[in-house]
Amino acid sequence: MIDSEALENERTKLKREIAELRAALNRKEQCLRDLETTISEATGDEDDVHPDTNGGVCHTQLSNDDIARYSRQLILPDFGVQGQLRLKNSSVLIVGMGGLGCPAAQYLAAAGCGKLGLIDYDEVERSNFHRQILHSEARCGMSKAESARIALLELNQHCEIRCHTRLLNSRNAMHIIRTYDVVLDCSDNVATRYLLNDACVMLRKPLVSGSALKTDGQLTVYCYGNGPCYRCIYPVPPPPEAVTNCGDGGVLGAVTGTIGAMQALEAIKVIVGLGDVLAGRLLIFDGSSCLFRNIRIRSKRPNCHVCSAQPLITELIDYELFCGMHATDKDNPLQLLASEERLDVEEYRNKVQQQPHLLIDVRQPAEFEICQLPDAVNVPLAEVLDDSYLKRFSKQLEDTQLPIILLCRRGNDSQIAVQHVRNRFPKHSIRDIIGGLHAWTHKVDPSFPIY
Amino acid sequence: MGTAELKIILEFSAGAELLFGNIKRRQLALDGTKKWNIANLLKWMHANILTERPELFLQGDTVRPGILVLINDTDWELLGELDYELQPNDNVLFISTLHGG
């Protein structure tokens, strides 16, 4: 019989090697482009190029290729040649190459933005494709920034793209952000949002901030003109339990696409000096009823800790500590229960599953519909917490010998459920399954779907 | 003021509605014989329509950090926050801040 595990390992290994080779090729191509730029500058090939004060180059004319390529926006009266030149001489930093960053980068590269910086510490995976539209199946496992660069250069080879593949933090943020004109917050977590805000205030960089979840999106521009900063609006971070990420709450790709495209638009307006920039206002998009709402938010807070005349925060702080949350949207395993109140998947499969027991899956019905264990009954966490489940199981719950097992996707919500149920039924054996259904796939049944 | 009702509209956006029976828009008819400010309104909401985990909406006497309150599409901080006195046909909107991308 063929050893399917060995084949699977070989496949994974090959895929990873191919991804690494692609990334290496990509870096070489960037080196070549950099070198060619240096050569053409040294030999004075381009007479429209002049060194600017930052040691970079400043274009003063459009090439014929530029004119043909950008003709449809060049003829806009408020945009014109000067607008295109400003874009060509601009540099934009995009933080997060996910659902917002991909479309934002795509429109900026297409519009002729001269230099794009892409920050993402993460790698491309299958669950990204529905909304992170620059990545491709062939680039699974590659750094998201590198993957996005490949797609963007196919779109516009004149765009100079710099990848930053590390997590943005208090030590590297100032150094990275300093060289860009505008910053796009396309991140997925609260800590990074405060970090970007503070750094942009200190460096006086406009910050185009987008966010999305489920079918809702929000957009505004901070640190622009007399408008407020993120801290003026949100002086105190939200409690961690009130924060939902896209991995837990879900999100539609067309919603992140809508907000990401508008982030590119606001960045272009800031660079070109076009129209009314969305500062001091918040755009709220409710995709489920296709409602856009533009609300007036407060101006600068006179005692803002970072952007007021007498700031308390004058250098970057520890933002994960400040927010009590990690600067990623990865799983943060909860540890609410003692080990005797928990069960690992093997123990459940080998012992408990063979006996009478009540297996309650506390995920949302839409998740339960995707996949479920045999014998599991679905009681969403909210119905556990408000006790509406009691009626449904009144008969079974009379038997104090019947073990109650709580289950969820990753073993966090199931702990919250155990805490609640054991208070009501102190005589029962009530436990949850460590690592939830993800652990089931990894340790018991590899054919069980992961989402 | 002959009317005994104060009619206002409450709206919820970006997930805040999940704490209020998943209803995004409500028309309220409050007791018009007394004055209502936002502080009283929050107490009324807590007692009458807040169905899920109150700590995800309130913190002490006010809304928790990360929820914006808009009165007629203007940030309540420009209008006196908890002390703002509700007027007939006011629209009060509660928005959860989103962080995902």
Swiss-Prot record, chain A:
GO biological process terms held by the UniProt record: Mo-molybdopterin cofactor biosynthetic process; protein urmylation; tRNA wobble position uridine thiolation
Residues bearing PTM Phosphothreonine: 60
Annotated GO CC locations: cytosol
Cofactor binding note from Swiss-Prot or TrEMBL: Binds 1 zinc ion per subunit.
Similarity-based family: In the N-terminal section; belongs to the HesA/MoeB/ThiF family. UBA4 subfamily.
Species name: Drosophila ananassae
SUPFAM superfamilies (UniProt xref): Activating enzymes of the ubiquitin-like proteins
Catalytic reactions of this protein: [molybdopterin-synthase sulfur-carrier protein]-C-terminal Gly-Gly + ATP + H(+) = [molybdopterin-synthase sulfur-carrier protein]-C-terminal Gly-Gly-AMP + diphosphate; [molybdopterin-synthase sulfur-carrier protein]-C-terminal Gly-Gly-AMP + S-sulfanyl-L-cysteinyl-[cysteine desulfurase] + AH2 = [molybdopterin-synthase sulfur-carrier protein]-C-terminal-Gly-aminoethanethioate + L-cysteinyl-[cysteine desulfurase] + A + AMP + 2 H(+)
GO molecular function list: ATP binding; metal ion binding; molybdopterin-synthase adenylyltransferase activity; molybdopterin-synthase sulfurtransferase activity; thiosulfate-cyanide sulfurtransferase activity; URM1 activating enzyme activity
Domain Rhodanese stretches: 353-449
Listed Gene3D superfamilies: NAD(P)-binding Rossmann-like Domain, Rhodanese-like domain
Recorded metabolic or biological pathway in which this protein acts: tRNA modification; 5-methoxycarbonylmethyl-2-thiouridine-tRNA biosynthesis; Cofactor biosynthesis; molybdopterin biosynthesis
Origin superkingdom: Eukaryota
PROSITE patterns, per database record: RHODANESE_3
Annotated protein name in UniProt: Adenylyltransferase and sulfurtransferase MOCS3
Function (record text): Plays a central role in 2-thiolation of mcm(5)S(2)U at tRNA wobble positions of cytosolic tRNA(Lys), tRNA(Glu) and tRNA(Gln). Also essential during biosynthesis of the molybdenum cofactor. Acts by mediating the C-terminal thiocarboxylation of sulfur carriers URM1 and MOCS2A. Its N-terminus first activates URM1 and MOCS2A as acyl-adenylates (-COAMP), then the persulfide sulfur on the catalytic cysteine is transferred to URM1 and MOCS2A to form thiocarboxylation (-COSH) of their C-terminus.
Residues spanning the signal sequence: none
Annotated InterPro entries: MOCS3/Uba4 (IPR028885), Rhodanese-like_dom (IPR001763), Rhodanese-like_dom_sf (IPR036873), ThiF/MoeB/HesA (IPR045886), ThiF_NAD_FAD-bd (IPR000594), Ubiquitin-activating_enz (IPR035985)
Keyword terms: ATP-binding, Cytoplasm, Metal-binding, Molybdenum cofactor biosynthesis, Multifunctional enzyme, Nucleotide-binding, Nucleotidyltransferase, Phosphoprotein, Transferase, tRNA processing, Zinc
Top enzyme category: transferase
NCBIfam families, sorted: PRK05690.1
Active site location: 246 (glycyl thioester intermediate), 408 (cysteine persulfide intermediate)
Subcellular location field: Cytoplasm, Cytosol
Cited CDD domains: RHOD_ThiF, ThiF_MoeB_HesA_family
Listed cofactors: Zn(2+)
From Swiss-Prot, chain B:
List of residues that carry 1-thioglycine: 101
Family, as annotated: Belongs to the URM1 family.
Changes after translation: C-terminal thiocarboxylation occurs in 2 steps, it is first acyl-adenylated (-COAMP) via the hesA/moeB/thiF part of the MOCS3 homolog, then thiocarboxylated (-COSH) via the rhodanese domain of the MOCS3 homolog.
Main location: cytoplasm
Numbered residues of crosslink Glycyl lysine isopeptide (Gly-Lys) (interchain with K-? in acceptor proteins): 101
HAMAP family in the cross-refs: Urm1
Pathway linked to the protein: tRNA modification; 5-methoxycarbonylmethyl-2-thiouridine-tRNA biosynthesis
Keyword terms, alphabetized: Cytoplasm, Isopeptide bond, tRNA processing, Ubl conjugation pathway
Role according to the record: Acts as a sulfur carrier required for 2-thiolation of mcm(5)S(2)U at tRNA wobble positions of cytosolic tRNA(Lys), tRNA(Glu) and tRNA(Gln). Serves as sulfur donor in tRNA 2-thiolation reaction by being thiocarboxylated (-COSH) at its C-terminus by MOCS3. The sulfur is then transferred to tRNA to form 2-thiolation of mcm(5)S(2)U. Also acts as a ubiquitin-like protein (UBL) that is covalently conjugated via an isopeptide bond to lysine residues of target proteins such as Prx2/Jafrac1, Ciao1, Eip71CD and GILT1.
GO BP terms, alphabetized: negative regulation of JNK cascade; protein urmylation; tRNA thio-modification; tRNA wobble uridine modification
Name this protein carries in UniProt: Ubiquitin-related modifier 1 homolog
Annotated organism of origin: Drosophila ananassae
GO cellular component terms attached to this protein's record: cytosol
Amino-acid biosynthesis found in the keyword field: no
